[in-house]
From Swiss-Prot:
It is found in: Secreted. The modification Cysteine amide is found at C14. This is Conotoxin Ar1446. Expressed by the venom duct. The modification 4-hydroxyproline is found at P12. GO terms for molecular function: toxin activity. It comes from the Eukaryota. Disulfide bonds join C1-C14, C2-C10, C6-C13. The cysteine framework is III (CC-C-C-CC).
Amino acid sequence: CCRLACGLGCHPCC
């Protein structure tokens, strides 16, 4: 995923 809440970048965190 690509979300600001997950940090600056795209990774499977959502």
